[in-house]
């Protein structure tokens, strides 16, 4: 890649690296480590006979094993996906509301995705209110931390912009995603190239109409997920 091209992609590359890095770190720490700590707490508060019991996700309650490392890999991948998603929707959200709204959004969407009345985590573990609260709090905390980190990494004086190559290091977590990470880079490069060749598309994407549609889509996702979360939560708590 020529130096001119490298300079051209450094700004969008740093933006992508911000979402990837923030999502990776938040996914591993909050969803991965935090999720295991939540399960440890629930093991302590639940029937001791559940130790060694397999959950619906294939993980062993109360035991650190190879499955735990796999879980960290999964949460890292999901975290990066969430960080990239945030980059897409970020401009639709007023700056001062980004952290609280993303915290709420991920609490609803993430909670609805995790909490299922038929799963072991929400039938055998006790107390059930604590289990429900923990698995809503974890995606909420992820949303808060990821957004906070991404906003700081997106600043002009962030560590990803202090050197011309720093953003490349910020994209390194994509290596954990193997072929998916390569696909993300190819799609991102394609979007960047399309934006350079068709500035009208960029203007349309940044228009008020697109912003309204984007906000409406986020609201629909949050409301739909929230309704499902309330329904499943009430079903679990009986």
Residue ranges of model-derived segments:
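Juxtamembrane/disordered regions of integral membrane proteins
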Residues: 2-238
